[in-house]
Amino acid sequence: MHNAKRFLIAILLLTAQLTFAQSGERRLLTLDDMHRFHDVRDPQISPDGNWVAYTVSSVDLTADKNDTDVWMVSWDGTQDQRLTTSPEAENAPRWSPDGRYLSFLSSRPGKAKGNQVWLLDRAGGEAQQLTDVKGKIASAEWAPDSRHLVLVMADRDTDEPDDEKPPDAGPGGSPPKAPKPIVIDRYHFKQDVVGYLTHPPGRLYLFDVETKKAEALTSDKLEAAAPKWSPDGKFIAFLGEEIKEGKDVDRYNTWNVYVIEAHAGATPRMVTHYDGVHAAASRSRVDWSPDGKLLAYLQSSAAKLEAYNMNRLAIVPASGGEPRVLTEKFNRGVSAPHFSTDGSTIFFLVADDRSEYPASIPASGGDVTRIIKGLGAISTMDEGKDSRRVVLAASDTAPAELYALEQGSLRRLTHHNDALMAQLKLGATEEFSCTAKDGTDVHGLLVKPPDYVAGQKYPMLLRIHGGPNGQDQHSFSFERQLFAANGYVVIAVNYRGSSGRGEKYGTAIAGDWGNKEVVDLEAAVDHVLSMGVVDPDHLGVGGWSYGGILTDAMIAKDHRFKAATSGAGTAFPIALYGVDQYIMQYNEEIGPPWKVGLDPWIKISYPFLHADQIKTPTLFLGGEKDFNVPLVGGEQMYQALRSLDVPTQLIIYPGQNHGITRPSYQTDRMQRYLAWYAKYLKGEEKPVPPTATAAAK
């Protein structure tokens, strides 16, 4: 059945390609294309350097979910093989150093609940489940001897229900027992997707491949993440956060580099003693020099301003000693450090102005060297035998694919989106710069409709990125291109607070949200208007997360916008104190209201407190279970505009967190964007999806 289905899909794709080839005409991007793209990630070079394992995510429209499979491409790019076909996702492929196995993590049905390690034998055969543990495996890394793995795993909460077992029913088939109350005693007690933080911390476990036994390396007094084996296999370096009796670890969020001997009963040794953040564990890794003497890691630039952190590359002796920051004067954030095979150089990725690229620096210190020129976004890099390097690269007109990086040039390895991209006619992306009224230099991107006609003025959409510590860059954006295909000029602006422009630019908005950013965004709109390409009477704005927050600020302060879409935002932050996951940021940047008074909170709540100034028809959206920026932020603004008789609507996505992940809801959201903008900027009525109740239509 599955083979027949795959064959039919292949025939349909081939027919579509042949039809396109015969017509020779490219078409505009449509909403139906949204889930036809494939998301390529996580390249891992094999020990012999001849293969690259990686993952490909695609959408199963029938099941209404995303599916991720493991693939493998040859170094010369001539062979590309899909290795897994399970309906459950497979992630984090890792080669055993002897090249015999390729492991991955998956929650496939098996002996134990949740993510487990599975093995593919290179000699052939189906994947076999390796681990059978009751904890939650976050990562698994091979030891140099190929006989052990280090697991990052949170012990199973004994109060947590087992989803694989039916709920216990009482005598005579009575209803199942009610779940136990949730007991909260942590300072930072909520996290989006995770939920209420009652689970034990992540710990390191040493797993024996032959005996299939896992032994604890670290205790529950140390949160551990991002482990890396030493070249000789005797030690493991990792990022850790100490949990002391009487010390509320959540108030400090201080991660340091640790080293532990790779055997049960060993005591972790703290290598660094930094009163700040060595990059959040999810964004960093520690790397050993080939001789085992040095460790490379990421150190934050602002110890108390993690939200605007610009990571710096640092090294420290593995035995302990004074760290040395190698990129202290570079003034750009870096990520993913790793030593060259000879140990003389450290490679890393740089977040620069509207781009991301690989670079290097001598391990002894010196100047940063950019490895590849041009506009684009290189977001991942791995190095293998004979200094072979593979990167994940994207551009304005090409989704991310794998490339071999050879002598400063890219050689294509994968082609998962080629057939679709060959059909499409895309809008041109241009850079622009402007000056805000306070003299700040502001940069952005502008996308024109594919059939743009010089001299004609188009409706404009200002689409605001979230973060704020992120940026719009030269990578493929389905959203920008879809809006352009629907006849809009789209602008994306890296306002103050964005990454890619240095530490001062990134931290400029700390404790002062929704003010300088608005100045920058207004300057960009003014600049694009002066170019003569947009109609000043047909301006729209929108964004998600911090982009939604700034959308609320824009429509409260700038009355030129005729339509807005505000997703997962808030305009009254004090109402989210203790309700969302940002308690540390509130206290560090603004201060508790009983300590600093209401004035600083009032300043950042302008849109809600001046909602009567808003005339822009606005669509609010959010996830029902968002703990990042809870739905209450959108509900309050919706209620305010509804009370003021300003055209508005609130869309709630059931069961969704901050990021909308269900494919049908992603389509729904984009369809509503298009319909809202078309109605208020073009005077067109476009169909919208059915809603849960007639009142919501």
Put a short name on every predicted segment.
Residues G49-V52, G99-S103, L149-V150, G233-I236, ...:
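Hydrophobic beta-strand positions that form the internal "hydrophobic ladder"
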Residues A492-K697:
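Active-site-proximal cap/loop segments of hydrolase catalytic domains
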Residues K244-E245, A303, G408, H416-D537, ...:
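Cap/lid segment of the alpha/beta-hydrolase catalytic domain
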Residues H35-V40, P87-A92, K136-S139, K221-P227, ...:
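Short glycine-/Asp-/Thr-/Trp-enriched loop segments that recur within the blades
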Residues D67-T68, A154-E210, D248-Y258, S300, ...:
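Predominantly five- to eight-bladed beta-propeller fold
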Residues S74-T78, D121-G125, D208-K212, E261-G265, ...:
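Short loop/turn segments that connect beta-strands within beta-propeller blades
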Residues P47-D48, P97-D98, P144-D145, P231-D232, ...:
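Residue-level detector of Asp-centered blade-edge/turn motifs that repeat once per structural unit
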Residues T62-T68, P109-N115, G195-P201, K247-W255, ...:
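Short, solvent-exposed loop/turn segments at conserved positions within beta-propeller repeat blades
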